[in-house]
Amino acid sequence: MKEKVFEAIKKSGKNGIRLRDIGYYCNVWHVSCLEYVAELMEEGKVYGKTIGHGWQAYIKYYVKED
């Protein structure tokens, strides 16, 4: 499952991807993907960026390029 989450983030490219869209790609509830995204962030493969502000803010995830 972690590999599938990473694949979804990688496919998004420079546009990034929201957690909700990762869940849609993996065909699971998006909150269940959060654990895998956190693991990928700890490993240094993925980073998150907050878009917007207030109640309309969301996080997009990107693959770190070496």
Regions found by a protein language model. Give the residues of each.
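Short amphipathic alpha-helical interaction segments
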Residues: 27-39
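Short secondary-structure boundary/hinge segments and terminal tails
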Residues: 27, 41, 57-59
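Short, leucine-enriched amphipathic alpha-helices that occur as contiguous helical runs
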Residues: 1-6
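A short, conserved structural fragment
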Residues: 41-51
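Short acidic, hydrophobic short linear motifs in intrinsically disordered regions
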Residues: 15-25
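Short helix-to-turn junction characteristic of helix-turn-helix DNA-binding domains
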Residues: 9-13
